[in-house]
């Protein structure tokens, strides 16, 4: 990549399986592992890009390697009782809007969408299950953030994701809420990593926030239209194998 070597590795996951990662490598180690002539066969790119697409995904665009990850799922016609049950529980009377939301994430990943805020003081409501479902659906294009991640100046690990989800949000400071609102409608954003120059990229991330605080998880002004708030009821039954 430019003048830097990367190695693709398969990192074991806690629940089984592996996740592909790209780690920095060097010429000397490459020669030791594969011989001096191997470097000539290594693919070369001018740089990275981030172009989200699920239907016609391209791993390489021109001479740039696409950092957006492909997802292995292919839509199929048929019944989907488990997913439908979860979406009905989360979105209730707005079920059709919830299905539209998921469809837009898949078909139009650069489309701006409202900040989805799921709140409930009760336990066992399925909020975390819904976040894990989104992660299972869109895989490495979903990242779990903490409240502190939004306040950090370093954002390179989440700025190029489709979905940024927070399992227990508490951004009750005015500056936190303003930053979140601005990000939800921003077309570009400056990425910053430790030891590297800032770089401006297209920003297409959507936010899904969960909270047990029904009254002030974030500051929402009267008339604000950038939030979609859903109060989630307790689950009537608990399917612990849903994501399997």
Which positions does each model-derived feature cover?
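P-loop NTPase catalytic core of nucleic-acid-dependent motor ATPases
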Residues: 54-163, 177, 228-231
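AAA+/SF3 P-loop NTPase mechanochemical coupling elements
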Residues: 154-159, 192-210
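N-terminal nucleic-acid engagement/recognition segments and initiation subdomains in replication
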Residues: 1-93
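Conserved catalytic/switch belt of AAA+ P-loop NTPases
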Residues: 177-199
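Walker B catalytic acidic pair
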Residues: 167-169, 179
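Short glycine-/polar-rich loops that comprise or flank the Walker A/P-loop
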Residues: 159-162, 186, 203-206, 222-228
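A short helix-turn-beta junction within AAA+ P-loop NTPase domains corresponding to the substrate/partner-engaging
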Residues: 218-237
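Conserved ATPase-coupling elements of RecA-like P-loop NTPase cores
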Residues: 172-177, 219-220
